[in-house]
């Protein structure tokens, strides 16, 4: 099935591993790391985990809450003052984390390459009106939540999400995960 997906389904490259009690039972990998099929996929290929990163970032947030550095009931602007711009002053941390902040997109067009310009993107978000009132409805923030929560973490700790990941999770748990 793994080989079939690589050959017939259009999957460019993939890997799959099963561990039990710290022992590798299955370790499959194949295909290519790029659509041009110039770089082979190997057992050490790092992949984008996309939405899975939300759970990892949530663990960082939970750790900050546990350390009394972040409070779900406080306003986001208590940590990130610029976030209060354009009618967002009363939005709580819990509202942001639960995709109820009305900040699920950008009001001005942005380019894919802008995603690599952290300060630019979070400034855009801080200086735009929300799409709806806080807690009015849940609307998934697929493209913006990483920037919004990431900037909140950065304001609380003075460190990037990636640095927090390394210090709070990777080091103590002896894991390998990268964000940023």
Predicted features and spans:
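Active-site helix/loop module of the DD-peptidase/beta-lactamase fold
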Residues: 43, 48-52, 64-108, 126-127, ...
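Amphipathic alpha-helical interface segments
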Residues: 118-121, 142
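Active/ligand-binding-proximal structured segments within catalytic/core domains
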Residues: 57
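Cytochrome P450
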Residues: 135-144
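Buried hydrophobic packing segments
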Residues: 60-64, 149-153
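Cytochrome P450 catalytic-domain "roof"
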Residues: 128-135
């Amino acid at each position: 099935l793994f080989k079939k997906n690589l050959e017939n389904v259009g999957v460019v490259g993939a890997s799959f591993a099963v561990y039990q009690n710290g022992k590798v039972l299955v370790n499959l990998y194949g295909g290519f790391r790029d659509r041009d099929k110039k770089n082979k996929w190997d057992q050490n290929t790092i992949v984008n985990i996309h939405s899975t990163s939300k759970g990892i970032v949530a663990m960082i947030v939970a750790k900050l809450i546990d350390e009394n550095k972040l409070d779900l009931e406080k306003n986001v602007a208590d940590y990130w003052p610029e976030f209060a711009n354009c009618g967002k002053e009363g939005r709580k941390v819990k509202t942001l984390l639960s995709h109820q902040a009305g900040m699920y997109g950008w009001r001005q067009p942005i380019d894919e390459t802008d995603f690599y310009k952290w300060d630019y993107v979070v400034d855009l978000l801080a200086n735009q009106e929300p799409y709806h009132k806080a807690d009015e409805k849940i609307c998934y923030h697929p493209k913006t939540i990483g920037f919004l929560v990431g900037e909140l973490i950065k304001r609380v700790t003075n460190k990037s999400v990636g640095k927090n990941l390394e210090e709070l999770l990777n080091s103590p748990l002896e894991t390998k995960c990268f964000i940023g």
